[in-house]
Amino acid sequence: MKTKRISFYIILLAVFACQPSGNQVQGANAQQETSEKTPTAYEASLPTLADSAIARGFTTDYIMGHFDPAKHPDFTLVDTRYADRQGLYLRKDTYEAFLRMYEAAKKDGVSLLIRSATRNFDYQKGIWESKWAGALAIENGKDASKAYPNPQERALKILEYSSMPGTSRHHWGTDMDLNAFTNEYFEKGEGLKIYEWMTTHAAEYGFCQPYSPKGEARPYGYNEEKWHWSYLPVAQPLTALAKEKLKDGMITGFKGAEVAEEIGVVEKYVLGVNSDCLSQ
């Protein structure tokens, strides 16, 4: 009987010895929670970037394009030597960086041409509503109002290449479209030469391609745009401010705006950009 009792206690002690202590369990749980909550470098920098945007006078109205670039003190008219038409505006800092990049490209036999620059809310509204109503065909050549009667489906088709008013990076004065509006142009000949130069040198002047190929690294947002380039020294703080302050419910004032919240347009489109454009 005594032998059985001793054997029982030995087994019991062995069981307790194999169990982690309460401190060990708590420590493991704490470590797991810490690991799960560890922010990315970009997320960690968001408060600083957003604060810098606010300190520079940026607001959600600015992000949403509620201003006239022709009357804004931080904007300048693009000289037609560098654009395909009159009346294009960029932020002064962005334009100065572009001019430096233009001259460097020219020395390498590459000619850069601005096709589109700042588009404020009203300008973007005109583009969006023309596509929404079918007055302007979408990229697949269809009349969206007839081909996609469901409002959310129609918005998603237009969003493949065009922004809802209030959500476009073109509102910011930091973004421009160069040379052509098709990816195919940049895949051969002169277009390929331009694109290879830009992917090699644009970062030296502060520029980044926000709409890289969609896939695992960028599952949401607009389709790839090899022509679209963004000036990061200003666009990065504005992106951070958008993440902090811009909400889907603020996206109003145009036909189809009612589906902005269903789609999650801020998270998926305003913030659905190339990760290289989020941190330097």
Functional labels for PLM-detected ranges:
Residues Q19-Q280:
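Extracytoplasmic cell-surface/polysaccharide-interacting catalytic and binding patches
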Residues A14-A17:
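C-terminal motif of bacterial Sec signal peptides marking the signal peptidase cleavage site
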Residues M1-F8:
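Bacterial N-terminal signal peptides that target proteins for export
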